[in-house]
């Protein structure tokens, strides 16, 4: 089967016929994974990757990887939240909270922080298991592509469940939509616009060799240096004319795909970081052709 790269622990714990509820020895599970598959990440009820808070494929407008460390405990409780009460900070910290890591969310927080990036998880169908009657209800490629852009392009990882049927095979409907999704992702990546890059303090300017129709901007921080950008303004211009604002975001992370409502024609796109946490490291920035 190849190497184990992820161990997904969702915390589900139903009662047995005698009414007894299983109690998990979480630390023993973690220690076993670390010993047998040290490169694997432990997700959801684990210390490495957190649940985004829903199973619909919805994403936050601004996803932070630096969050209260108590979120590492959040999914271990039956009510799916963890009460943090250490004398310095007392509030309910839940995976589904809309704002987990902004300056405002952390303003009164005195507890420890953790690098705990999010995972968006959903299914090709309305549920996690295969039912023959749902073969005509597989999600459309456009919907899945939108979720991909929002998650992978929103500083989160993306887990897409594809349920096998009773024969251990993937249904033709799922296979078809996956192939089409792969084509759309490949097409998106192939439309990267070649540009020269000029860095000047808080500005990163992309200069095109000719007017280009831009439908999206992709920004990527060097997360080895942390997640630092609090706000960035994107502007465009034609042949040295005055810049006009086309987008504004409040965090970036390892990747932020900014899809423009209407493509813009430009010879230059500038990203200005207006707020950051002790500077920033923008590893990559590029436009996507319409």
Task: Set out the residue ranges of the language-model regions.
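Short, conserved beta-strand segments of beta-strand-rich sandwich/propeller modules, principally
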Residues: 268-270
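Mature catalytic domains of secreted/periplasmic carbohydrate-active enzymes
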Residues: 1-240, 244-262, 272-286
């Amino acid at each position: 089967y190849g190497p184990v790269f992820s161990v997904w622990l969702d915390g589900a714990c139903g009662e047995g016929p005698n009414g007894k509820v299983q109690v998990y020895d979480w630390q023993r599970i973690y220690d076993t994974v670390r010993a047998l598959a040290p490169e694997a990440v432990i997700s959801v009820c684990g210390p490495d990757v957190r649940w985004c808070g829903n199973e619909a494929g919805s994403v936050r407008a601004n996803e932070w990887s630096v969050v209260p460390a108590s979120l590492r405990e959040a999914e271990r409780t039956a009510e799916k939240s963890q009460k943090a009460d250490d004398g310095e900070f007392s509030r309910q910290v839940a995976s589904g909270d809309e704002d987990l890591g902004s300056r405002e969310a952390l303003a009164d927080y005195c507890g420890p922080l953790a690098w705990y990036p999010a995972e968006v998880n959903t299914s090709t169908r309305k549920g996690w298991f295969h039912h023959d009657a749902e073969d005509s209800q597989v999600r459309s490629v456009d919907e899945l592509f939108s979720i991909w852009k929002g998650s992978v392009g929103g500083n989160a990882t993306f887990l897409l469940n594809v349920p096998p049927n009773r024969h251990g095979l993937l249904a033709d409907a799922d296979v078809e939509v996956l192939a089409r999704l792969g084509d759309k992702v490949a097409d998106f990546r192939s439309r990267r616009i070649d540009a020269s890059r000029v860095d000047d303090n808080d500005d990163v300017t992309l200069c095109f060799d000719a007017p280009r129709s831009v439908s999206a901007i992709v920004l990527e921080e060097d997360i080895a240096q942390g997640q630092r950008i609090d706000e960035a303004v994107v502007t465009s211009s034609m042949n040295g004319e005055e810049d006009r604002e086309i987008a504004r975001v409040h965090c970036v992370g390892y990747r932020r795909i900014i899809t423009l409502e209407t493509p813009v024609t430009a010879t230059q796109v500038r990203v200005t970081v207006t707020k950051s946490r002790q500077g920033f490291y923008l590893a990559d920035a590029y436009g996507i052709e319409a």
